Amino acid sequence: MMLCRLLEDLDCTLVQGRSDIEVNAICCDSRSVTPGCVFVCLPGQHTDGRRFAHAAAAAGAAVLVFEGTLPNFEFSRSCSPALVQAEPGKARRVLALMASRLYGYPARRMTMIGITGTKGKTTTAHLLAAVLTAAGRRVGCIGTNGAVWPGQRHTLGYTTPESCELQHILRDMADDGCDACVMEVSSLGLKMDRVGGIEFDVGVFTNLSPDHIGPGEHASYAEYRAWKSVLFRRCKVGVVNADDRETPAILKGHSCRVVRYGIAAPADWLALPGFTPRRTADALATDFTVRLPGGRMADFTVPMPGAFSVQDALAALAAAGVLGVPVAAMQAGLRGAAVRGRCEVVPCPAPFTVVLDYAHNAAAAESVLTALRAYHPGRLITVFGCGGGRSRLRRTGMGEACARLADLCIVTEDNSRGEPLEDIFADIRTGMDRVQNGAACVEISNRRDALLYALGLGREGDILAVLGKGHETTIDRDGRKVPFEDAAVVREYMERVK
């Protein structure tokens, strides 16, 4: 595409170079620069993208986009990219709109569903994708578990990728025949304009509780909530949780039609009281009945435990209903859905059940462990840790929740990011000590050793809940990511004791 076409009506100005040059890609990471691409220098908390302008130009970038100035920037005859100055604070917006235009507005070629909230985004996204697939749609899914569509799976660095990566993925999905995309839209994804230029057909709100508050994230809970609410000014229909107390704030200033789902509050999609937990060899399922819009009743099964899974399923069903999916397809899709690392039961010949879940804060841990209690385990054993370089309140909260709800806690590492484990463990113990007559605790620094120890304790009827990493395939030790997967350790143990 010609640069002049790419720059039309954007908040930026060509300050040096020609506008009639061809560009073929766009990126914001200098390591991804290819000859003929646009490199956008993004301002950041720890570094400034302008520092990498020389490297990008040397690698063949045809255009550099930046805010402010490029200090001490000199070109050689063989390295003289066009320079585009973005208006102050607009570089991210310019990146998003450029990427959307360059890749042919791929979001317009698909039905776009965006899901936001503190908990349940990944589960809701994958349940909805399964339901839409059962209805005959070809569906892509973007979020914490990566970018996935039929025959393709790609890992991502963020729940909501940077806009240049996101638009490239959307183009690949659309070119591969996808007619729907379900994606997780994080608060930072909205704040950093990663979804700029996308109008969602459906926006979904799951729930809200304090999280992602601190340096590099959000300055306050109010700011966190405000950015979540932006989605409902960028979608045609908003599907919201009638039971969540923050829903009115999320809908403040909304411009969409609203559909509500819930368990307790009046809702268009209402789950009736009396969920039935079912425990089988390969699943902890929940049966429930929904009163649909218009008053009809329908029975559903979600292959996951707990009221929170019913709530996530309701969100998916309500969104599917907005899109005209028949009830029979909803039932079949939901029943056969699987979500990696979200209350995932690892198939094993042992007489106890192993559940993997991504829960990494107090609210999520409490939801999971409360749900597992409904299956009346002999003992509920949990293995968990907390990440380094994150809020200490998350650690004390996790410790308190696990001590209150489990019979035995095995505390271990979880992405320490260079912070001493003894400091992390001390914060977890502080939370556990708040609980009178709480669970017994064992500390084992190495996560593999901790898992093997817990598996060795398992008896008939027990449930072993492994929390924190879920789908992840690496662990961060001292700032270095090394291969590690909870499920692989479980499978290794089961092979050994067969």
Q: Model-predicted segments: where are they?
A:
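Acidic, Mg2+-coordinating active-site environments of NTP-dependent enzymes
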Residues: 9, 57, 71-76, 175-176, ...
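Well-ordered beta-strand positions
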Residues: 38, 63, 202, 237, ...
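A short, gly/pro- and small-residue-rich
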Residues: 49-61, 82-89, 200-206, 224-226, ...
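ATP-dependent carboxylate-amine ligase
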Residues: 1-14, 32-38, 48-51, 255, ...
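Short secondary-structure boundary segments
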Residues: 66-69, 185, 207, 242, ...
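Short, hydrophobic beta-strand segments that form beta-sheet elements in well-ordered domains
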Residues: 25-28, 60-67, 182-183, 237-241, ...
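Phosphate-binding loop of NTP-binding sites
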Residues: 10, 92-242, 246-257, 314, ...
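N-terminal leader/targeting and accessory segments in enzymes
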Residues: 1-97, 270, 279-281, 297, ...
